[in-house]
């Protein structure tokens, strides 16, 4: 299966021109048993997957989605370009986001840490409330050495894990995001330097 999948990924890179890949997973089950009763180490199987794809596309950008922080304790050592985490319950507070970001930096081997902390608040509340929540989320992540996957194409925001379900941002929100991203770039030596730890 892995050889077939890796060959398909390499073909996509070669024939379609993709220069990067996001390897996804469901997050569950975290344990598996084969029909013959053999227990499968799911975390180790993801490591094998990442390594197999990296061999097939050595020059592509490659990230693996650690859904709900699984298996962040092992996957960052695999040959990928960032530690990417999609947090779900019980990661529902800024404190919990900070813990996830800090832990990812500790095991990340100097790789950038990116969290897909979707701002679904924009679906439920006025823009100013969504912007306030986004500022708090970005402050939490930036101050713990991580960034947030939020800004999409054509001024849209990712508000849901199903990326095609995104939301156009108002001009005020885009201006706010630009100022925060400018701040991150201007201060990256102290915010996301992998050598700085809590």
Segment roles from a protein language model:
Residues 1-112:
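Active-site neighborhood of glycoside hydrolase catalytic domains
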Residues 49-50, 57, 64, 74-80, ...:
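Active-site-proximal substrate-binding groove within the catalytic cores of carbohydrate-active enzymes
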């Amino acid at each position: 299966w892995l050889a077939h999948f890796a060959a398909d990924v390499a073909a996509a890179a070669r024939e379609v021109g993709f220069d990067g890949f996001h390897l996804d997973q469901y997050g569950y089950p975290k344990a598996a048993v084969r029909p013959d009763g053999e227990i499968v180490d799911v975390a180790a199987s993801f490591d094998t997957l990442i390594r197999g794809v990296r061999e097939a596309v050595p020059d592509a950008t490659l990230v693996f989605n650690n859904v709900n922080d699984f298996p962040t304790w092992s996957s960052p050592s695999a040959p990928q370009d960032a530690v990417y985490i999609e947090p779900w319950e019980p990661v529902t507070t800024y404190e919990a986001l900070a813990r996830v970001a800090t832990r990812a930096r500790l095991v990340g081997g100097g790789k950038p840490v990116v969290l897909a902390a979707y701002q679904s608040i924009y679906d439920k509340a006025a823009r100013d409330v969504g912007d306030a929540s986004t500022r708090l989320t970005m402050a939490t992540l930036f101050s713990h050495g991580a960034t947030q996957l939020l800004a999409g194409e054509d001024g849209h925001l990712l508000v849901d894990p199903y990326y095609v379900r995104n939301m156009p941002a108002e001009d005020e929100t885009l201006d706010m995001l630009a100022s925060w991203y400018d701040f991150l770039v201007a201060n990256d030596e102290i915010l996301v330097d992998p050598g700085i730890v809590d």
